[in-house]
A protein has these predicted regions:
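Active-site flanking residues adjacent to catalytic metal/cofactor-binding acidic residues
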Residues: 91, 113, 163-165, 191
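Switch II (G3) loop of P-loop NTPases
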Residues: 167-169
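Short, Lys/Arg-enriched N-terminal segments with co-localized hydrophobic residues
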Residues: 2-13
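Short, conserved loop/helix-junction motifs that constitute active-site signature segments
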Residues: 83, 103-106, 180-186, 215
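A short alpha/beta connector and helix-capping loop motif
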Residues: 173-200, 204, 208-209
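Structural motif
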Residues: 86-87, 160-162, 188
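Rossmann-like AdoMet/SAM-dependent catalytic core
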Residues: 23-82, 96, 142-159, 195-286
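SAM cofactor-binding core of SAM-dependent methyltransferases
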Residues: 66-140
Length: 286
């Protein structure tokens, strides 16, 4: 009996010791993994990642793509289908606002939000600024998309809208918390997604899958632009830029099943003057 008890105690001690050693190794190697873009978390198999990317293959929009905004960073490609869109909601105010300026010059009301700045760099009679971060809830310096839209357009619950969002990783919780009825009002959605290089991390992969589950209910991807601010990583033969700019269009405005063939649109421009990034064929239905 005594020997059994000692044996069991030894097992417990060894199990605890192994757990502590694994924890120490994880903590020590995690910064190294962050630097070299690998993770110690549970990994996703390449076929699952390819399946997700396959859902994101761009289809052709009914109207041709045009470029709105400046050359380089801050300019985006979206369909030439802006007539009838009453307002653009643009969370995340940077030093660059020419995308918003050009839309305002076309007669669109522009609603901007960001707690980190006092006001947009440029002024325009159609600009309406809210000093709040946009996120999952209404609390403190945060406001949800539904609350923001309802307060901005209190007498309009049906008009088409445009969403342009670059909020440094908060796009995920913002999309999750947005009502489907509001999401459906956005004829055009332009989002920069961050941390795409984590697509092989199991938890992030689940989050990414669920985000696009929601976005693709009534929208389709029509354009993907890799932001070349950081270099592309390659895992299991799959190229993944950390930052990807997606243009999505409501399904009544696309040619369903007609996929884009060109990997780089003639109007695409590098965000910064570094090495060019071109997405590989895996990102397109060829």
């Amino acid at each position: 009996m005594l020997s059994n008890s000692i044996f069991k105690l030894g097992e417990v001690i060894m199990t605890d010791l192994k757990t502590k050693i694994r924890s120490l190794i994880y903590k020590a190697l995690t910064p190294v993994g962050d630097y070299f873009h690998f993770s110690l978390d549970f990994r996703v198999y390449a076929p699952a990642v390819k399946t997700l990317i396959g859902r994101l293959h761009p289809v052709e929009s009914i109207k041709p793509l045009i470029r709105i905004g400046p050359d380089g960073d801050g300019g985006y490609l979206l369909p030439d289908d802006l007539e009838g869109i009453v307002a653009c909601f643009s969370p995340g105010v940077d030093v660059e606002s020419r995308f918003e300026m050009q839309l305002a010059d076309r007669g669109m009301e522009l609603f901007l939000a960001d707690y980190s700045v006092e006001k947009p760099r440029f002024d325009h009679p159609r600009f309406h600024f809210t000093k709040k971060y946009i996120g999952a809830m209404d609390h403190g310096v945060f406001m949800s998309m539904d609350t923001w839209v309802n307060k901005s357009l209190p007498n309009d619950a049906h008009s088409d809208l445009l969403l342009q969002m670059d909020i440094e990783g908060f796009e995920y919780e913002t999309i999750f918390s947005m009502s489907q009825s509001l999401l459906n009002r956005f004829r055009i959605i332009v989002i920069e997604f961050h941390s795409f290089e984590r697509i092989f991390d199991k938890q992030f992969f689940k989050q990414l899958n669920r985000v696009f589950d929601k976005l693709l209910v009534n929208h389709s991807v029509v354009h993907i632009h890799p932001n070349n601010y950081e270099k592309t990583i390659v895992v299991k033969g799959i190229d993944v830029p950390p930052f990807l700019e997606f243009t999505l269009v409501r399904n009544d405005k696309v040619h369903a099943g007609k996929y884009v063939k060109k990997r780089r649109h003639p109007l695409d421009q590098d965000n910064v003057p570094l090495k060019k990034i071109e997405l590989s064929p895996i990102w397109y239905r060829e």
